[in-house]
Amino acid sequence: MSHGPSPRLAESPQLSKSSLLTILGSPSPERMGPADSLPPTPPSGTPSPGPPPSLPLTAPALLADGDWESREELRLRELEEARARALQMEKTMRWWSDCTANWREKWSKVRAERNRAREEVRQLRQRLDTLTKELAGARRERQEAQGECEARGRELARLRGVHSAADKTHDGPEPEREQEPVRDIGAERPPGSQELDLVESLLKSRPEEPEGCWDACSVAAGGPRVSSGRQDRNRLPWEDTASTEEDASKLTALRLRLDESQKVLLKEREDKLALSKNIEKLEGELSQWKIKYEELSKTKQEMLKQLSILKETHQDELGRMSEDLEDELGARSSMDRKMAELRGEMERLQAENAAEWGRRERLETEKLGLERENKKLRAQVGDLEEALARRRRQNASALDCDLRASQAALFEKNKELADLKHVHGKLKKQFQEKVAELAHANRRVEQHETEVKKLRLRVEELKKELAQAEDELDEAHNQARKLQRSLDEQTEQSENLQVQLEHLQSRLRRQQQNAPLFGKIRSTRFGTEEAGDGASDLDEDEDLQIQVA
């Protein structure tokens, strides 16, 4: 509404100037005279053109000054509002750039975590491959050790069969009864210990019956040489001593070989036990690693799904944000263009204002000159009263013409004012539309802020889930360590029990070895009366062996 009177006030000096020119522009003093003589003739009803023009000159000037000041204040206020909007747009753009930078940092962190997880999975796969290779090698070594043990067992069984055949041919039925429990125990003992017991029994029985031992050795060597060996011993006693020494040396060599084979078998048994334990341990670790690998693969798939979903949502958000930024940039460019137009219009209005002020000063100078001329004309009023009376009709017609001209000019000015009001209404509508667009943009910005907050909350939830998964993985590692420690303790306990069992077996073996000697000594000393006691001792030994077994 403040823009409405501005065109009329801007053009009011021109109207006063045209009216003054129409009234005072005539060079003949006869036309100017009747205008000054109008005040003393009120019955005529015509307006006086003399002093009244001073009032329409001063009042429109004051109105124009106030209107221009209000318009300038309004334009300055609009300019400040436009600057504030531009600053707000810059702040929003800066905020969006910070948001995008934060999202890039977060995505880089997530990408680094994903690469780290991939590297851990790759390392676990490599370790699994190495463990499978080691397990395969351990299995091959175990099979080779089993084959070697079977070969050594067959060889020892063959030697045991040879010595048992020699004992059967030499000792007869009584030694068979004495060595019968030894054979029963030998079925439960390793072949090396059985062979060692056979050799010791041969050595112990040799001082009592050297000829029988010689016969057994000769029978083991070959049948045709037995008769010839006996004839030679009967013929040559010194050859008997030489053969016994040679036989003793052979027995010692055989005993050494048996000791070495027993040591080798014990060592191989220990290696076999260690390999079996290592294989079981590796199989347990392999199963654990397989379970962990499956869990990691599942977690990896879940994380990949979540990452793909987040990536899609982020791409959608980036697309929407880019579209919004393009819209904001377009609105900002339009606002800049509008600001430039407003600035140009303001400069133009300032130039027009300066021109109007110059025109006003010129009109004031002209007003002062006209006042002086009016004073001169008032002096000539008395002289021109008669001429004015004669030309009153002519002046009345001239005044009617001037009135019509002024009315036509006023109609044109009113028409221009209506056009300016229409233009002002259009500009006001455009301004309201821009304000509505700005409000819509602000609502869009608030929606984006809420979406960004939701995404931040989702990222925090994902971080918490990742921390929970890491805690569960640590708990699984701790449980695996606890199980490993318990397994180590059980293996130590089993080794201790194995050592105790070996001690008990060795004691039982010594008791069994000493039992026949004690029986012989007691039979020679006390006779046949205490034979029942020896049998009871043997029964007690057998019961002890059964309990240990």
Curated annotation (Swiss-Prot):
UniProt keyword DNA repair present: no
Tell me the gene name: Ccdc102a
> Where is the sequence biased in composition, kind Pro residues?
37-55
Which keywords, in A-to-Z order, does the entry hold?
A: Coiled coil, Phosphoprotein
Q: From what superkingdom does this record's organism come?
A: Eukaryota
Where are the Phosphoserine modifications?
12, 26, 28, 536
The protein, known as? Coiled-coil domain-containing protein 102A
Basic and acidic residues bias: start-end ranges = 135-158, 165-187
InterPro entries per the UniProt record, alphabetical: Myosin_tail (IPR002928)
Q: What is the lineage of its organism?
A: Eukaryota, Metazoa, Chordata, Craniata, Vertebrata
Species source reads Mus musculus
Where in the sequence does UniProt note compositional bias of the Acidic residues kind?
Answer: 530-549
Hey, what's the signal peptide range on this chain? none
Annotated GO CC locations: myosin complex
- According to the UniProt entry, the coiled-coil residues are 69-160, 263-398, 426-517
Please list where the region (Disordered) is annotated. Answer: 1-61, 135-195, 207-248, 472-496, 509-549
The answer to whether the entry has keyword Phosphoprotein is yes
